């Protein structure tokens, strides 16, 4: 299994990450599509080839082609939006009413349940450090019926995969 490849490749100092990966992959808080879509979207957001490759392989066993495309779409559109909305926030009130003017059609028609796409967008936004987008997507998934525990499960996946990507980069540079 690909997740096992990631875990076995982690150094001893990343044992907590290894254990967290195992626990999160067995999570029952999320549906299978929510879980593996989160793993895939976040793996893409880490920008780490090994993490993305290993997670992609395993996610393909759990997700439809539509869900794979939607998860990768969430990672891609959030890469754009997170930069734009962070900048808008930094620039202050003078920019609050400035129209974004960027196409974001995938958010309206992601090809999967809206709540799943929004959850993946939230997880990616946490990796990318966009407070505005994280809060906006949290509000949407809460209104769609997800619990705080389900939302935080996606955040834990994001945090753990980012840590795994960091450990892999550290080891590659040693």
Swiss-Prot record:
UniProt-listed Enzyme Commission number(s): 1.11.1.28
UniProt-recorded name of the protein: Alkyl hydroperoxide reductase AhpD
Subunit annotation: Homotrimer.
Keywords: Antioxidant, Disulfide bond, Oxidoreductase, Peroxidase, Redox-active center
Record-level Gene Ontology MF annotations: alkyl hydroperoxide reductase activity; disulfide oxidoreductase activity; hydroperoxide reductase activity; peroxiredoxin activity
Family the entry assigns: Belongs to the AhpD family.
Pfam families, per database record: CMD (PF02627)
Enzymatic reactions: N(6)-[(R)-dihydrolipoyl]-L-lysyl-[lipoyl-carrier protein] + a hydroperoxide = N(6)-[(R)-lipoyl]-L-lysyl-[lipoyl-carrier protein] + an alcohol + H2O
Cystine pairings recorded for this chain: 130-133
Function (record text): Antioxidant protein with alkyl hydroperoxidase activity. Required for the reduction of the AhpC active site cysteine residues and for the regeneration of the AhpC enzyme activity.
Organism per entry: Corynebacterium diphtheriae (strain ATCC 700971 / NCTC 13129 / Biotype gravis)
Active-site annotation: 130 (proton donor), 133 (cysteine sulfenic acid (-soh) intermediate)
A single BP term in Gene Ontology: response to oxidative stress
């Amino acid at each position: 299994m690909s997740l096992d490849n990631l875990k076995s490749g982690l150094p001893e100092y990343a044992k907590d990450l290894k254990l967290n990966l195992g626990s999160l992959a067995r999570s029952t808080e999320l549906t299978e599509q929510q879980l593996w879509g989160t793993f895939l979207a976040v793996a893409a957001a880490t920008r780490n080839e090994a993490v993305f490759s290993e997670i992609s392989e395993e996610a393909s066993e759990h997700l439809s082609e539509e869900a794979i495309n939607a998860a990768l779409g969430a990672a891609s559109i959030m890469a754009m939006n997170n930069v734009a909305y962070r900048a808008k926030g930094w620039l202050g009130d003078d920019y609050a009413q400035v129209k974004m003017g960027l196409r974001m059609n995938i958010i309206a028609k992601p090809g999967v349940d809206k709540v799943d796409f929004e959850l993946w967008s939230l997880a990616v936004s946490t990796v990318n450090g966009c407070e505005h987008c994280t809060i906006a997507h949290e509000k949407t998934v809460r209104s769609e019926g997800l619990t705080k525990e389900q939302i935080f499960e996606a955040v834990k996946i994001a945090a753990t995969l980012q840590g795994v990507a960091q450990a892999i980069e550290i080891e590659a540079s040693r």
